[in-house]
Amino acid sequence: MTASDGEEPDVSPADERARESLLPWAGQPAVLLDRHLRVLAATRLARALSPGFRPGVNLVRFTFLDAAGRQDSPSWRAAADHIAALLRESLDRHEGDRGFPAVVGELSATSAAFARSWAGGAPSASSGSVDLPDTAVGRLSLGYRLTRLPDDDSTLVLFEPLDATAREALRRLAVRARRPPASDRPGRPGADPAGRDGAT
């Protein structure tokens, strides 16, 4: 079965384990990354925050290629430097992994911003804040915490609101994220009466 059949694609045991590892944080934005910063799994609320948090997306490529139009934003530059630092730290911990040269080589050749961030050598941080300017509920400033999971060599990223305004915006986003797409609502052509969306 494929996604083009109108159903969810087949899920590998590894993907299923990644999803299950996020169940304790199902009510908040949470993302699980592999050593190359590819998204293994993300909660429904995280996916609603940014297309960069969809499973299968490489967060480094997304930041420097897909979201490159935001390079004039100070918040983008700060986030980009942090993403590059995380990749560098992971590379240092996994010397000999052949996946890293491919990512670093591709981005160094195609993104001047990545080359600058990579050469800058900014240290990584296990916590901080990120500014998301164009979510479905407007600009959101969130805190984040990184936790390395040694059993499967992945990194858990948990986001949380920094103030009451962000908390309310995140609540509204959660409500929106729980709604089925318009095409799936009862009474519309092609609607799925069971309301399935496969989200965590």
Per-range role (PLM):
Residues 1-22:
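HTH-adjacent hinge/linker in prokaryotic transcriptional regulators
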Residues 5-12, 168-171, 175-200:
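Actinobacteria-biased recognition of intrinsically disordered, low-complexity terminal regions
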Residues 127-129, 144:
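Short, acidic/polar N-cap/turn motifs at the starts of alpha helices
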Residues 137-161:
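Beta-alpha-beta core module
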Residues 26-116, 120-125, 132-133, 150-152, ...:
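PAS-family sensory domains
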